[in-house]
Amino acid sequence: MRHGKVHRKLNRTAEHRKAMFANMAASLIKHEQIVTTLPKAKELRPIVEKLVTLGKKGGLDKRRQAISEMRDIDQVKKLFAVLAPRYKDRQGGYTRIIKAGFRYGDNAPMAVIEFVDRDVDAKGQDSGPVQEKATEAA
């Protein structure tokens, strides 16, 4: 019987799953759109929805709960300062999952998970080292 088996294990230990979803939630809040496998996106959605609800409730205790869940203080600040006011009138359903074909190599089903009414400019922002074009000194 599969009674009580609510979440997917994703072939990872409990610690690995928790860390992975904390990192994925921080990435989704930072970029407001990420590409991942479909099962991971489906498991990430309720985590992020609950984080946005924490942001909407506000308060120091909710901020500390979000920090313990996500472990990225900069993204918690964005959650409470940017995302919470954006979704203050929306009762849930802050994210959407769009199927994005299959990954080359292992044929894994891929998906895009993104915030509804997302900021298009946030995608790819501060996503790692960026080479700046060297200006020629004449």
Curated annotation (Swiss-Prot):
The keyword Ribosomal protein applies. GO terms for biological process: translation. GO terms for molecular function: structural constituent of ribosome. Pfam families: Ribosomal_L17. InterPro entries: Ribosomal_bL17, Ribosomal_bL17_CS, Ribosomal_bL17_sf. SUPFAM superfamilies: Prokaryotic ribosomal protein L17 (SSF64263). The keyword Ribosomal protein applies. Transmembrane segments: none annotated. Part of the 50S ribosomal subunit. Contacts protein L32. This is Large ribosomal subunit protein bL17. It comes from Nitrobacter hamburgensis (strain DSM 10229 / NCIMB 13809 / X14). The lineage of its organism: Bacteria, Pseudomonadati, Pseudomonadota, Alphaproteobacteria, Hyphomicrobiales.
